[in-house]
């Protein structure tokens, strides 16, 4: 039974109402510093920890709760007579409920004007110590680190005579250990990122020790293949526009491959300002287009490769209305992603309950780093978020691209970034015409892209081509020109750039260099 609670929080969200409810249930309240003042000002009967222990706060508040009367009351096992006798001998009542959250270390170091001294002062000592004590003794002590759990604890107390059951206590304890591990990980990441000057402003992007924290969203039926087990985890600092924040409106449970492909589709479609549609198959775009609206964009994207679009993942950057829904519903689709779906669109898909509908807010979707596991290690890099500005482009051929060609080139370049290397993308009039992906030879990607267009009945005459990396020889360029391309955009940087540029001039096409490569593996 909970008779006495100790409350000490930095995040005071909901704490007054929670403490009042505890007091109404007859629970004695102990508290520290600002929390105690807040509760007292609200008219609640509260005892300062300093008065409770008979020992004042000291060292500018660094020592408040580090006292046997606090930790003895938390750690004592109620089922061990010798523990309870020791408490009685020293006049220590039990503390049955601990409500603590920690100094805002992560928020502090995120500030541009944060100093090392500021960071150090926001490393909580007493809070984690109490939390770990209570979590260790969770059989007898209820510990709350998250304001979202206040209602859960109160409901259980009211239903069970001020008692919280072991399953809840265990869940809350595991939450505490996860929280303190993440807190210590953030401190380690920060301190090991400091350079020799030990100044906040001189932090390295890549700390000497990297701690990562994720919460499990769900277990998955299997992984990339049926013989592999899998689960999906969410980054604790997930941006609003991230796939992990999806809201599923209908459909079967997402699979491992659904999630991986959906991320590729969503990240690609968000890069367009005009209404856009992206169709993904095996993490590669097989159709991308912009249009007057979602239905128009889908119709154009689907034309690129109707065969590959079968069973694909489709993403829109605008609301899916009834017209778009009716067009998509004619095909077999695994997942449909959009910022929103109209009521009429939802009605269209109500007859196709296996189709997974995901709503995600538009916005940034990834944190600062891209991670890839290798045997025994982890590759960490900044995101490939570089967007080439028109002022950075260099026309290196005798012929300048027309305004329309430049629009097509920039569209193709945007798509090529999301195609597995080696990538060759033919585009025209705001849509992909042929996509060559993932080949070991760039010239083979060029051939495949032109074959794809031919199979779809699309002409490449007057098309624009993007290559995610430079042409090592002129052969790849010769292939795309033979297919009908009149302009090419590529990074440049080959030892044979002069030869490739000369070939472009020989063909009478325009070539634009970006100076930026977009390998994708």
Swiss-Prot record:
Its EC number is 2.1.2.3, 3.5.4.10. CDD domains: IMPCH (cd01421). Keywords: Hydrolase, Multifunctional enzyme, Purine biosynthesis, Transferase. Residues 1-145 form the MGS-like domain. SUPFAM superfamilies: Cytidine deaminase-like, Methylglyoxal synthase-like. One of its GO terms (cellular component) is cytosol. HAMAP family: PurH. GO terms for biological process: 'de novo' IMP biosynthetic process. One of its GO terms (molecular function) is IMP cyclohydrolase activity. PANTHER family: BIFUNCTIONAL PURINE BIOSYNTHESIS PROTEIN ATIC, BIFUNCTIONAL PURINE BIOSYNTHESIS PROTEIN PURH. The keyword Transferase applies. This is Bifunctional purine biosynthesis protein PurH. The keyword Lipid biosynthesis does not apply. It comes from Burkholderia orbicola (strain MC0-3). Pathway: Purine metabolism; IMP biosynthesis via de novo pathway; 5-formamido-1-(5-phospho-D-ribosyl)imidazole-4-carboxamide from 5-amino-1-(5-phospho-D-ribosyl)imidazole-4-carboxamide (10-formyl THF route): step 1/1; Purine metabolism; IMP biosynthesis via de novo pathway; IMP from 5-formamido-1-(5-phospho-D-ribosyl)imidazole-4-carboxamide: step 1/1. InterPro entries: AICAR_Tfase_dup_dom_sf, Cytidine_deaminase-like, MGS-like_dom, MGS-like_dom_sf, PurH-like. Belongs to the PurH family. Pfam families: AICARFT_IMPCHas (PF01808), MGS (PF02142). The IMP cyclohydrolase activity resides in the N-terminal region. It catalyses: (6R)-10-formyltetrahydrofolate + 5-amino-1-(5-phospho-beta-D-ribosyl)imidazole-4-carboxamide = 5-formamido-1-(5-phospho-D-ribosyl)imidazole-4-carboxamide + (6S)-5,6,7,8-tetrahydrofolate; IMP + H2O = 5-formamido-1-(5-phospho-D-ribosyl)imidazole-4-carboxamide.
